[in-house]
Amino acid sequence: MAEPQKSSKVAIKKMEDDLPPPPIPDSIQVIAPASQDPNPLPVPPPKQAFSKFYQQRQVNELKRLYRHMHPELRKNLEEAVTEDLAEMLNTEDPNAQGSVNLDKVLPGEVQSMRWIFENWALDSIGDHQATKKMMEDEIIPGGDVKSTSLRFENQSVNGDYLSTTAKVSETDLARGDVHTARWLFETQPLDSLNKLYSDETEMQEAVLKEPVQGGDVKGAKELFEAQSLDAIGRCCSVEEKSILQLKSEIQELKGDVKKTIRLFQTEPLCAIRDKTGNIHEIKSVCREEIQSNAVRTARWLFETQPLDTINKDTSKVQIIRGISLEEIGRPDVSGARWIFETQPLDAIREITVEEQDFKASTDFVTGADVTKQRLLFGTQALDSLKGEASESVAAKEQVIGGDVKSTLWLFETQPMETLKDNVEVGHLKKVELSAEEKGDVKQRKHVFETCPLGSISKAFEEEISAASTEEVVKGDVKSFKTLFETLPLDSIKEVDAEPITKEEEKIPPGNVKANQILFETTPLYAIKDSFGNFHEVTSVSREQVISGDVKKYKWMFETRPLDQFDESTKKVDIIRGITKQEVVAGDVRTAKWLFETQPMDVIHHQATQGEEHPSMKREISQRGDVKTCRWLFETQPMHTLYEKAEKKQEEDVSVPQADVKSYTWMFETQPLDSLKGQEEQYLRVSKAYSQDELQGVDVKTVRHLFETEPLGSSVVSEADQKKTLRYSSRVEIQSGEVSRVKEFFEAKPLDTTTKPTAVIKDDGTIEAGSVHKFTWLFENYPMDTLKDSSEGIQEIPPEKDIKGGDVGGKRFIFETYSLDQIHDKVDETELHKIQKDTMSKANVKSCTMLFESQPLYAIQDKEGGYHEVTSVQKEEIMKGDVKGARWLFETKPLDQIKKEEEVFVIRAVTQEDIKKGDVQAARWRFETEPLDSFPGGKISVPRTVDDVQKGDVQSNKQLFESQQVGQKKYVRMVSVSDVQRGDVRTSTWLFENQPVDSLYGDADRSSSISTVQREDSQKGDVKRCTWLFETQPMDTLKDPEVTVSTGTQEPIPRADVKSTTWLFESTPLDKFSASECSRETELKERTMRETLETLCTCQAIQHDGILIEANDTESVKMVKYQLSSPGAPEILKEEIVRGHLQGIMLQLLHRTNVEPQSVLVEEDREGKIKVSSLQLLDQSEAIKGKEDLSGNVAKALQSLLSQDASIKKGMVIQETKSESVKMTLYSLLFHSVQQKVVKGDVKSTIGNLMASSQEQRATVTVKREDNEKGNVQLFASCIEKGDLDYLKNLQQESEIQSLISAQAEQGAAESAPRALQSTNTHVLANKEQVEKVMAEAKSGALEGAKMVFACESTGKEGALEREVVHAVGVTGTTVQCLGKPQNLPTGMEKEEIMSGGLKVTTKSIQRVADVSKNTEKEESISACLKEPKATMQGIAQAKVTAERNEVVGEQQSLVTEQASQKQSEEKVLGNDLQAAMQSLRLATAEARNIQHHVQSKLQRNREEVHMACRQQVASKQETKTLQSTIHQQESASTMRENTSTAIRTSTTRVQEASRTHTSVSQKSIASHKKVSASEEVQGGQLLSQENQVVPSRDVSIKDGLYTATPVKTYINPFVESDYKEQSVQEERDVIIRGDVQTAIRALQSAATEQRLVEKEDIVRGNLKATLQSLEKSNVNVSKGDFKAAMIYRNAGQSYSVCKKKSETQVNNNQTAVVASGSQADNDFPPPPPVAVMKAEHCPPSTKATREGAPPLLTSKDEAPGCFSPLQTPLPPPPSLSCKPSDQNSTEKPKIPPKPEITAPLRKKPVPPPKPEHLLHEAYSASTNNSTNRSTKSVPPPVPPKPPGLREISMPKPPPAELQLSCTEVCEQSDHRESQDKCCTLESSMDKSITVHGPERKLPKYTAKTPLQMAEERYKARKGGQGKFELDRAKPSKPVKNGEVG
């Protein structure tokens, strides 16, 4: 055993590798014990097995655990485990031996088994309890056994379930119930298994092990391989026939889909066990088989009732364990057997069943054919059974006659065609071998066919016991099989049915087709008419009407002339008569209807008089040239007519049981004269025999069973008897083919229909209600061709190919021509809502309109019946130059009209053409009149008179079966109005039906249209023609009765007729635009005004703009409005334009000046209006282009713009003061106004919405799709790594972040200040508030946002400042406000979220606070800045210190703010934050020193440039703000760092980096787009406009937020969405930063004066430039890798942010001052873009540089050049920014770089060491940024975004180390160390910083000098000097690299 186990271990390993069948038998053996324990099963009986069973279980458990072990660990444990297992198993030698033997004996089989069990979930191995449970709660679900078992056989994935089933089987096996196990495998729904044993993982332990004996294992294996599950165990496999007795069968053939429903009754008492172990007796079984060309499905339904007590011998109760389908492929017949796995009830109770009985499973049938291999009855393959069924039975169990238990139940399904129709017998009796074998098989069969099961079972012993079962050898399964297989069912009838039986037996028995004794076996049935012609019967339908005691039968034979008999192929049976046999068995009576047929050669007419004279009526309907005759044959049984009471008694009581009464009606041929034209022909009954008479009559006929019906229903209850019941059944004999449709309509009480009695018409016609569908074809003719024949709405006769029963509907046609000349404007009373399908076929344009249910539109047919119009198809027909229209109305009969329903009768169709410009629309009006307005009821029953004598089938309106020509008594009057207006002529046809007799006084004379009177009345330019169509009998055609009809028509009061006109627009859908009538437009006008007002009231509209509202599918209503006064929009212009709202929105989204954030105004059903912000546009997405708009935009479009009749949806495009386009989407209830859709990316809008719903982050708009995409990868990686917790955190964080970032980014993009405000608001307020704030912010007013904020708080500014201050003061508060971020955060999440949300939010809040403080300060400062830049510089120096500490302080007199922010930062950071803060402070000290130096320079520069560029100062402030934001972020990250110092450090760095990145991105954007430059300029302007400064600051904050997004970058690696978010955000940041610099300045100024939302305009311009530069820099972004794009965006953002900072710094720097002077003014100019571009382009080199020091130098030179200019203004922060960008781009995954950046920021004071590190890091960062942009490496950009997340997700030591190292580097740790720790990222960051620093002050502060130099260069470039500076910067960069190196 040890060895086997060993091998089993190996096998297990293998199993893990490939679950499929393990090759090693030993392993199999082991597994078998483990999973299935097949070894134990075979050897020991279940009882014995149990003791060992538990040991086995332990072994299994051990094995299960073993499987879960790591392969390495397993190696170590292998020997010990093997030994232990060997010991355990050896204790039970038999088992061990069995398993070993198993391996040896059935290696292949065992392997199969093992393979199956191996596939179980590892943890599902081995639980004793599970097994026990299974035993206790056994469920016997029904269902598709085959597919279920196939599932088990083929699926390895569902191992768990298998194991469960195995377990169950084991338990059962323990009971000796192997079959049960098999059943479980086959039939137990997987989910039920799962539920039952969801907690039991050790199911693997297959209880089978012990109970299964050696032979059984083989069976089990076979089961899985190829044999029916019953092969496994103790279940007897029984064929369906033996268990189930067919009660009834319904076959439907529709097209090529055949549906067969069989209702069975279980013969031996069968039961099913449910999960709880309760046993339910199966009352009936239904199998539904649907067979189409390729697919065949079967469903078993069991009807059960609880079996509380089993009165019968338990040995007779079979528990059905499973059902399996065995298909035996035969060349000609596909035989399928349903095999039931049954188990004697008593066997279940016995734990041990003689396993010998099941050992037959050892007969393993080898063979590749799975179906053959499948063991029948658990042990034998079907093919072995076929010849030797008895042997197999013997092998299995001695079959004792009558012993149901051992009976072989063989149920083979033959192709459905081969089953005789009489299988549909009313009640089938089960064959109980025990009792029934004594009976006559034939008799039994008959019973099956004709008796209800219940009656058979009760009466069997009495009635049928007499029959001799000698034919069937008792216990001989073979004979039974023969019985069921070969004997036609009808040949097994009761003795009483002998006549039938004999006749039916003429069909050769044994032939499978014998079962189809119906019309199929004798394919051709004919009826001979009096002419001697034969008519082939195509379908037979019988209708039985029971009204009270009277039964009437109506037989309708549909025939077609049989021109010649093809005797070679068919034998023609002439239907001579119909026999009704009433068979009574027990208390159940069944009637069988048989056709008496005579072969052609034996036709003699037995014309004897019948007491009854049912007649066969013939209807001939001419379809084309084929005459179809319908022969109607009605019976009225004598006894029901004359001896009702007696007969009733007889039927009830005196009819002897099993007595068969038969009545035969023989038809006689009718004299020729009896056949009248087209009337139905009645077959006259020559003689009606009763049974007794029949005996003596020499009728040589073959009887074919048409159908059986239970007679019990006639005696059921008196109440029922009073009702009129109608049974109708129909068999279609389709040219003798097997495929037929047999539809039975049973026992539908007529009272359920409107007219119970209407069903029985004397003439036998089908009543109107029974025809299901009418198509109303309105045939129209050109006006000039209007003839008598055209009745306007004409009913089209059924098409030739429509079969009688299929004639679904009437079709009415209405045609008009010269559409182009028919114009009229008629007020539509009602606009019919229709759905149009426009199709063009050649010259026929067809448009189908589906009518809605209310009101009902009806069309009257000739008989006056109303048909509900379900759809109208309009075809425009071009004939030459004449345009015609044809209306085809599809209808369904309108059986009953409820009072509450409005029914409009369509009288005519009117068309009017409308021309608007070059759009021509045709309007179709249906002239209707309410049904109730018909006078008196005359018109309500009009029958149109129309026998248009044309050969054309359409125009020759042949009466449908039930319509009689003679009944046409109505004239249709058409009134045509021709209205000529200019060149427009409209003709209106009014068709009215008047009873002819109302016109003539004689209804009989009307047979055809006689005249058309046209009355022209000209009034002015209106000419009215009245056409009167009158009908007269053909013979009276010449008598002109026109006047009468005219007179009649004229008086018809027009007022009485409510005319409802349905307006159908015929314009092609794509041109369906201005076709609405003016009235509608007015309505919409009102609606539009309401919409505008509503939107104004909810403050969604704050600027002038355009409101576009979805009008219909193809047009939109556009209203240009202007806000003359708040809340009072004035509509300047309104028009309907063709187009899709969605298309318009998408187009708008692609415009550059669209604000990313839009407002979503929704009105719920209660009328509450909810305003939320929606991120329409990712800034990054804007670059990405259309393909990225798909996801969120699509969702937004669908949700917002999907049409809803009750909802007004649309968008408002407002032009804000900043000239950006703001989109407001609205969805209002009909009374409410549409939302205005702010232009923007719908995706981003959606993202924004989502973001607003969650916390707003100043991150990029979350792209839903990107998020998801990213998440997929991230999740995949997480899953691969097994980091599920992270995944969860990530998920939450990423969602929040993405939302926040989406919002933040949107906000930033739209207006950083607003975003900040909204973010703050969001943080402070709840989501709705945030949404409001966002919406307001979006609305384009920072002020508005502030106002919202104020509303939520106190004063706008006060509240905002407060909140900001609050945020600054209490980062925790901010975090709290953020809430989710704070909670999520703790460590990793916090960082992520915080970086994304908290950091960003905190930073943004802090920034806002700073901004507000700065705003206040900047208001003063901006004054100071503007005026005393020196002050600014001083402040800036202070700020530098503050920035180093916390950039927050910068603008806040920078120092104060710094302190507060520092405090908040520290608070937020906590201890870790403090540590981070300390490092930050060190960095800050360095940074301050550097900053002081730089600021001194900058101050000089600023002083110099101050005049030149206050804006630059502002930008500097922005930069500082950014820095402060970064610092805040650092603090936030520090806070997050609380989780881990390393992480914190990295977070701080990341935050710094992200901030730096933001700065860099901004700078990059600025340089790329020159937007940063322009933004700087704008920012300067904004600074000048202190208000703007606040916005700039906000932008900085946003940058910070974006930086947070970069921080997120770390998360991004895992979460692509984060990645994407970050990248998107960063790109947005970049864009925004292009803008953002300006925006930052604007935000700063906005912070100062958040009211200055207008700065957004600047942001917008910058956005464009930024986007352009981003596009340039991030070429890949547009190229398509979203990730790459995101990365690039992020990189770009960081880069541009850094750049912005650098630029700002450059402005501050003296050199920068000059550059900034020119740059600030020329920020937009190419120089900055060049620098940025350079930096961005540098990325590749930078990347290389990052990767290698020398390359870094080179790229550094470039990238730093770019970065340094950007960074120069804020040397350290820019460096940081650069770093973050680089890191984001290159090492986004690594948070460390960002922390490094942060450290560099702090380090700024420490010049030399930090510069090196900074240079390295900064350079690498810049390189990264550049590289990211160039490379489009999503990961880098993302890092900035999710630093926190990243740290968390990356919480990887590396990030932390990197962060620490970065911090250390910042702290002057060895730069190389930092680089090493930070990896290239840090180096890049350091380098970037260093570059920037060195540029500024290479000697003093490397970082400063490089940055300064870079910035100066950048500015010089911008101004023209930038190039020189860049050159300088490049050199310094190399120096930096050298230093770094």
UniProtKB/Swiss-Prot annotation:
Residues 1-41, 1514-1568, 1715-1856, 1914-1941 are annotated as: Disordered. Xin repeats lie at residues 108-123, 143-158, 176-191, 215-230, 255-270, 293-308, 331-346, 368-383, 402-417, 439-454, 475-490, 510-525, 548-563, 586-601, 624-639, 658-673, 697-712, 736-751, 769-784, 805-820, 842-857, 880-895, 917-932, 951-966, 982-997, 1020-1035, 1055-1070. Its main location: other. Residues 1834-1843 have a biased composition (Pro residues). Residues 1514-1565 have a biased composition (Polar residues). InterPro entries: Actin-binding_Xin_repeat, XIRP1/XIRP2. GO terms for biological process: actin filament organization. Expressed at intercalated disks in the heart (at protein level). Residues 1820-1833 have a biased composition (Low complexity). It comes from the Eukaryota. Belongs to the Xin family. This is Xin actin-binding repeat-containing protein 1. It comes from Gallus gallus (Chicken).
